[in-house]
Design a protein with these regions (language model features):
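Phosphate/adenylate-binding glycine loop and adjacent helical scaffold
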Residues: 1-169
Length: 169
């Protein structure tokens, strides 16, 4: 009876006894709008195992890596569009970043919280970087996939000066 939610269109194959339901994302119209702002589609798919040994194979829409996180009553923030699938018990909400809008970087995050399995995907390879308390690390906003809620982040231009900002992106 295990249930997994996935982005619509992510299913590659599944056991014939897996039950599939289409669901709208979010709670109500504002929840659906918030989910869409956070990078989720308007609909998701819910897969429920009805027999022992049921399986499902999922893949993102583009090439790249998939990685698994086991959440245990904690919260992560994921880049818009990184969510592939997760346990039904996880709560997912969209969250725009005022920091990103002011800086022009356009970072929208998905807040994923609770306990359960979570699969995220990325265009390209995934590198996991564990930070020590107080350690700083610079990541381009277009390449950041996810981070724990305990991480404090700021959005800055990597290059100094107007010409350097245009030339470096």
């Amino acid at each position: 009876g295990e249930t997994v939610r996935a982005e619509a269109g992510a299913m590659i194959s599944m056991s014939p006894t897996v039950e599939l339901k289409a669901k709208t994302t979010g709670k109500g119209i504002f929840g659906a709008i918030g989910a869409m702002v956070g990078g989720e589609g308007l609909f998701s798919s819910e897969y429920t195992a009805t027999a022992a040994g049921d399986e499902i194979v999922l893949a993102p829409g583009g090439p790249g890596d998939i990685f698994h996180l086991a959440l245990s009553e904690n919260t992560i923030f994921a880049q818009s569009g990184a969510y592939l699938a997760g346990s039904d018990e996880l709560q997912i909400t969209g969250q725009g970043s005022l920091k990103a809008m002011v800086s022009g970087e356009g970072l929208f995050l998905q807040r994923i919280s609770g306990s359960g399995d979570l699969w995220l995907s990325s265009y390209g390879a995934v590198m996991i970087k564990e930070l020590s308390v107080g350690e700083e690390y610079v990541v381009d906003t277009g390449n950041m996939i996810a981070f724990d809620e305990s991480v404090t982040y700021s959005i800055n231009k990597a290059a100094k000066g107007l010409f350097s900002s245009f030339a470096s992106g």
